[in-house]
Curated annotation (Swiss-Prot):
Protein name as annotated: RNA polymerase-associated protein RapA
Binding site for ATP: 177-184
Keywords, alphabetical: Activator, ATP-binding, DNA-binding, Helicase, Hydrolase, Nucleotide-binding, Transcription, Transcription regulation
Molecular functions (GO terms): ATP binding; DNA binding; helicase activity; hydrolase activity, acting on acid anhydrides
Single Gene Ontology BP annotation: regulation of DNA-templated transcription
Highest taxon above the source species: Bacteria
Amino acid sequence: MAQQYLPGQRWISDSEAELGLGTILTQDGRMLTVLYPATGETRQYATRSAPLTRVRFVPGDEITHFEGWKMTVREVDDVDGLLVYHGLTAQNEARTLPETQLSNFIQFRLASDRLFAGQIDPLAWFSLRYHTLQHQSAQLQSSLWGLGGVRAQPIAHQLHIAKEVADRIAPRVLLADEVGLGKTIEAGLIIHRQLLSGRASRVLILVPENLQHQWLVEMRRRFNLEVALFDAERFIESDASNPFEDTQLALVSLEWLKEDERAQDAAFAAGWDLLVVDEAHHLVWHPESASAEYRLVEQLAEVIPGVLLLTATPEQLGLDSHFARLRLLDPNRFHDLDAFRAESSSYQPVAEAVQELLDEGRLSQQAHQTIHDFLGAEGEALLAAATDGDIEASSRLIRELLDRHGTGRLLFRNTRAAVQGFPERQLHPYPLPCPAEYMELPLGEHAELYPEVAFQSQQEPADEQNRWWQFDPRVEWLIDTLKMLKKYKVLVICAHAETALDLEDALRVRSGIPATVFHEGMSILERDRAAAYFADEEFGAQVLICSEIGSEGRNFQFSHHLVLFDLPAHPDLLEQRIGRLDRIGQQHTIQLHVPYLETSPQERLFKWYHEALNAFLATCPTGNALQHQFGPRLLPLLEDGDDDTFQGLIDEARAERERLEAELHAGRDRLLELNSGGGEQGTALVDAIEEQDDQFALPIYMEQLFDAFGIDSEDHSENALVLRPSEKMLDASFPLGDDEAVTITYDREQALAREDMQFLTWEHPMVQGGMDLVLSGSMGNTAVALIKNKALKPGTVLLELLFVSEVVAPRALQLSRFLPPLALRCLLDGNGNDLAAKVAFDTLNDQLESVPRASANKFVQAQRDVLATQIAAAEAKIKPRHVERVAEAQRKLKAGLDEELARLVALQAVNPSVRDSEIEALRQQREDGLAALEKAALRLEAIRVLVAG
């Protein structure tokens, strides 16, 4: 045994192939020393059990000299135990290469190379590679790719908008849903799907400073998107010439970017694919002038191909302000305000006619004439059928009208009135006597609304005997209310973090009720833990006390009792508070509990919100406008003023609200709502996601993946597992997300309630990263097994091969939709027959047993010539299937893009919102895609040798 190892021989490690080629240094009978020059590592092995395989190339192999030149082997000599290769270079020059001069960096990655080099993998890894290919192929072709993995309830209008917009090249749209309908989720879905498809690689998100944290939490928690938050400090500390170029997703506050010219220059030059702007209705524009913020966004929109503007509804904005947003998207199309006003007024009668068609099922003479004037003669047949009550004709007629709508492709706007699924609200006011301690407080800084903060600021910090919660009647009321609601989860929101912390103290000291807090001073991890403690049904807190800012971006809809311990100074903040529970999918009526101090400003603010704005029982789209209009008169009356004057203000504001709401309702564009709601397409997406959620394919696959990589999984609770790296963890780069442990769930409902758990879907970075590790490495591309089947004569050899049709092209072409990495499987018997169609992979897999590596290697070396011939024969057999798959991919690409091109060209003829650049980009994508598919190659992915026993 000792004579087989000689200094200078090249061997490769069976267990550490990444070390490259090893060179025998010494061999003293019992111990063997091997140097791996590529990494500078040295290993010592017991001679009798060294996990090494001799590197022996054969004629036809291409080998590399350590200086980098290559040659194809023609002959091999054995000179005193060392191999000497003779062959020809690419220039047909004869060369000799002793094995001592082989490149140290040779790694055997091709399946056939690794098989013949003795690098034979465990059976489980071969199976994992096959299943990884199948699952990846299915996902890349799925219409749900980028839509199904979000930690949110699947909602039809959101999914419809996301798919419609994300599937465009460089989309430029306005997302203008009413409050509470999920504009941020729509934007996140669009970003996520564009990134996964390759349509976008780099995204700039521009938001008001007070929304930065909310966006950060939403992107990370819901979409698993790692967003880099940029501010002045981070920008200055960066060593890069352009700090933005180091990140894929940047989150920037509009206030900071507006003031920092160097950061602006860097943003303009960073080469973004998509710009997302939240609260875009605050960008001020007039025909004569524009604000600095508006001009900044305008300049960015000129250099960034895709733009998403999140804004208030057009009715709330007013026509001029709405025009200002559209100018940012398409300045060539929207350059004349007067022309836009005229165009918009022409759509209103059409929208009213559509409303009549929807309500009555047929058209009056006037409505018929309105639509005829709008469509012209080409729509006459459809119009006649729709007038007679033909339902299918009515649907097609509405689609035709939508296609011609001036902003139908640019603007998506849903209203609560049009979207189903919102809960009702019930208000429970609790007037309480105002304590004497608050009567003497100085006014200012909203002290009249939050007297506990003003009172506590006057006390000594160490004075535990004089705490506001010892006398404030709201605290006693809260304790009694929580006891009464002891079976329910209760969310308490107050304006300040200090109040939230004090309330936790009060509940602990005075009642023992289990509570947890949630405020802006906590880290994201601490907030996750607090939210998880609140969500836990069995052992969790009954009450979660949140500050105003701390609860931004969080979803607590598993609760339906909301205590507003105080009231915010603005109706938008009140709506945000209620919106923590009042969301689509909430199963119960929202119970709003509002304590307030009598004869104090709190009582008047309660009446203002309830009687003037109706802000408790319904969303208040006019709240911001009314606050702006009446705020200067309201504030003095909160502190002082007689009751009659205050009541007069309430009556005036109520009348104005009713007038504005009537205007909004009259201005509703039913055509836009139909386009934005998604109809049957949106419902079909929801059904498909729910069906995917109910399948067990992902948990089964992930257990296989965890076992292969040495990740331990154990039950945590119902529908949840804890993952930990085991002592045998194979690869430290496995994207577990935590070095110690991580809790996961495959259940969407569980994930919505427990944000501390990772929600595993096919799109999750852990799943995608694990699949990438399998397919980018070589592990599992060879195997040798014993097959136990009475129908096979002992000694019979079967060869199972997996091939992949591979196309090298930019991800933005999305060729994986048409030619995904599906495994083309071939199962050859000794006569060269392909049995793959008759014997399924899993059926065969169940009949296999492992073979010791040494025995497997010995068999492979003995059968090398036969196996090499069979591999070549298998490739010849599979080639026609590859050619057929590529041709089918070309047909699908051509048909799909030709149809989309024809639709856009026809649409452009009747709707100027279709850009020339969009059509040209689609034509280019078609040409580039077909050219890339023409070069698709067949690659041998994996080999398994099966010996009947």
